[in-house]
Swiss-Prot record:
Domain of life: Bacteria
Keyword Signal among record annotations: no
Membrane topology field: Multi-pass membrane protein
Spans traversing the lipid bilayer: 13-33, 38-58, 67-87, 125-145, 156-176, 192-212, 222-242, 243-263, 298-318, 359-379, 399-419, 435-455, 519-539
Protein function: May play a role in L-lactate transport.
Main location, first listed in the record: membrane
One Gene Ontology CC term in the entry: plasma membrane
UniProt organism field: Bacillus subtilis (strain 168)
Protein name: L-lactate permease
Organism phylogeny: Bacteria, Bacillati, Bacillota, Bacilli, Bacillales
Subcellular location: Cell membrane
Amino acid sequence: MWEQLYDPFGNEYVSALVALTPILFFLLALTVLKMKGILAAFLTLAVSFFVSVWAFHMPVEKAISSVLLGIGSGLWPIGYIVLMAVWLYKIAVKTGKFTIIRSSIAGISPDQRLQLLLIGFCFNAFLEGAAGFGVPIAISAALLVELGFKPLKAAALCLIANAASGAFGAIGIPVITGAQIGDLSALELSRTLMWTLPMISFLIPFLLVFLLDRMKGIKQTWPALLVVSGGYTAVQTLTMAVLGPELANILAALFSMGGLALFLRKWQPKEIYREEGAGDAGEKKAYRAADIAKAWSPFYILTAAITIWSLPAFKALFQEGGLLYQSTLLFKMPFLHQQIMKMPPIAPSAMPLDAVFKVDLLSATGTAILAAVIVTGLFSKKFSSRDAFASLKETGKELWVPIMTICFVMGFANLANFAGLSSSIGLALAKTGDLFPFVSPVLGWIGVFITGSVVSNNALFGHLQVVTGAQIGAGSDLLLAANTAGGVMAKLVSPQSIAIAAAAVGQTGKESKLFKRTVAYSLILLLIICIWTFILARLGV
């Protein structure tokens, strides 16, 4: 049994700085050294291994086991999800459905600023609410490329758009997890987030149009922007207040997407915006409603499948004692499972950490996407099973590098968690006293940057936020909300998100360029959250 050591140098700030070394190296590798994502991720993993074993005295066999668990998590479920999502997209392209999809979107508006709002913001948010785990960024970015957007720009815009919806991904799991850690109801934490996230949700559509066409774009499309921002923010806020986090994205996205489509039947900007090299807006051919519905079928089949997979009754089938429980394979990691003790104040008392590699063959989100692939293939008469498998092989060849990048990132994330590196950073930030509400979102940002997940971030730092809040007299619900909101802003730049987005638009190897496009906006949005959280704490919210 090994106990985590959070201050190996006898100075919390020095220990935190050493723990921060792998993150600083990764940032340097992408921005200054301009390494490819896979090399930057591998070297970051090597640096974190050295820091964990040498500085934080983690036994070598436990460090190796934690890395292997992380790499396994990168393959399943994350790599599986990305592979299935891109495969579905490729089938939609190869069956000719995108010609009709492009025309149907152009029929709503040929203006790329408005197409960005429909697909990059609304549809992105809808998929985030239904699936999460990289699916919305992969699908919506690929759709934008088909509509004539430049690949890296499409990926960056979808990453930035995700700031409005990332807290409520996969039926609200991040908020539900944070609430459990803080001994709150999901509705309580959701209502606290009402004070923070709707402000960001309202700003994001304006930011997206500004990035595409500067102030000219905002001036020319402000009525549509008000429909999207106002509708999305109002419904998201109302849902958070009345129903909780589960449907906050889905209802808001459906309302704003439907509202914008109806509004654009009566209003269009005087000047149509198309990016240079984007070509025309798509075929002007009038398709039958049945043809349009069939073209969009891969995505509403995907939505239906993910919705079914998210139902409590369906999930119950895979729980212990459930009919399909045996379909989930569990592997306890040697030298790691319950062999490391998380210590106070990170945990209420010394507690062993579980380390189980879970292969949920049927209940995984990737399997829901696979079901959508199968149904789509069955209804595509001119697309044989041989064509489908050839497309899968092509997808695998394209994605093996980004999936390995994700594996290395997850290896680092797991190592940072099990070695106590993340906790060391968190404890140093918690020493800021009355200023902690200002830095509380920064802790969430670091958590998501490391793990790539708002859920994992809340599980990692949620208790620390609660403990620190009790020490300084700040509400635990506000700090948990800050941890969640700050974490969402890191989804714009987390290595996992960057790798998925780059792969989805065929730009693997250009992760550093994509990172540079999003990092400034991630930090600006984080600063807004920090200032606002500090103000709310001073007001006693």
